[in-house]
């Protein structure tokens, strides 16, 4: 549980300051959602090209120093188009448990890395990137999972749950 009074106070403050403080720093995320929504077509004949366009405005959401999930999933889509298409179809299947879908996406990325990685050390398809893909497709239902932010909010709200690295499924239940 968490302190509901702190939650309400934080929410009021966030809403009060949103336009002046938050929106300038957050607008690009919603532009990325719009770009994704406009370009996403899982049945595209040029799936890799479509994926490139759909993810083109994600910027630091799917790329940072030594972390390249967008570039890697696009590279996999160029090499193994039907496998990556199937990964996204399963990820976006709302009839299945979200934690199972995320785990399956990671495992399939592992297999792609083994087969097509050409010595790459990792595929970068972890909870943060996968939750970003979910959020881009269903922004009213999902948001980007970032353990450091989850912990910060948990601390601010005086939550009694301890969020741990690698315990994504448990963390998701308690968010």
Task: Describe each model-derived feature in a short phrase.
Residues 130-137:
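Contiguous, well-ordered alpha-helical segments that form the cores/surfaces of helical PPI scaffolds
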């Amino acid at each position: 549980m968490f302190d509901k009074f702190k939650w309400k106070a934080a929410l009021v403050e966030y809403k009060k300051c949103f336009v002046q403080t938050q929106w300038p720093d957050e607008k690009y995320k919603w532009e990325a959602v719009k770009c994704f929504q406009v370009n996403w077509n899982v049945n595209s004949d040029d799936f890799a090209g479509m994926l490139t366009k759909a993810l083109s405005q994600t910027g630091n959401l799917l790329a940072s120093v030594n972390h390249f999930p967008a570039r890697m999933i696009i590279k996999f889509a160029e090499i193994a188009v039907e496998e990556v298409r199937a990964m996204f179809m399963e990820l976006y299947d709302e009839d299945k448990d979200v934690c199972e879908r995320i785990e399956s996406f990671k495992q399939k990325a592992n297999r792609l890395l083994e087969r097509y990685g050409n010595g790459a050390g990792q595929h970068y398809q972890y909870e943060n990137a996968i939750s970003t893909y979910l959020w881009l497709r269903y922004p009213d239902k999902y948001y980007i999972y970032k353990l450091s932010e989850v912990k910060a909010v948990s601390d601010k709200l005086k939550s009694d749950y301890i969020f741990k690295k690698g315990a994504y499924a448990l963390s998701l239940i308690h968010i």
